Amino acid sequence: VDRDQEEAIVADYVKSPVQYVFGGGAKLFKNRKDGRDLFAELRAKGYQTPKTWEELSQIKSGKVFAVPYEVDTPLPAERGDLLARASLKGIDLLNQNEKGFFMMIEGSQLDDYGHFNDLDMLMQETHDFDRTIGAIYEWAARDGEPVVIVTAYHETGGLTLVGGDHKDGKMVGKVSTGEQRGDTGPVY
């Protein structure tokens, strides 16, 4: 499957054992070329499919497939701490499993803004992801059990810091490509 075959990719969610999803792309689940309503199929498999953050915040247990945005989630300046809240909501739901859980959180727009060489938006997305990971580390420290791993599967854009002033909290960055590079992502 090619990454551009979005409708085929999201159809696989119906067969997946995943317990919690939050993100954008609602348009790919309804009004499809194949006529399927994936939200209805997910509900038939026991998923709750809230259409807003308010609906999601009221859910106390069970499988959740929350894709309230037609395309992408809002820009960082418009969404506030949405990624952190959605991540912590998922943790609250998944943590009810006595066997534990695995959760993957992706800062998906980081890749897009790397391809676009948009340093301002890349920094906003990075800051949002950092805040989210900070909230998760705080939760993990309180809980005492979880292992939190942060990594990247590749780098995009060839971002290099070429100047700035640490005291002022400013930096100057340059990009060398709009493509993915073969660099291995670090693990923290």
Sequence positions of predicted segments:
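A post-motif C-terminal structural segment
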Residues: D2-Y188
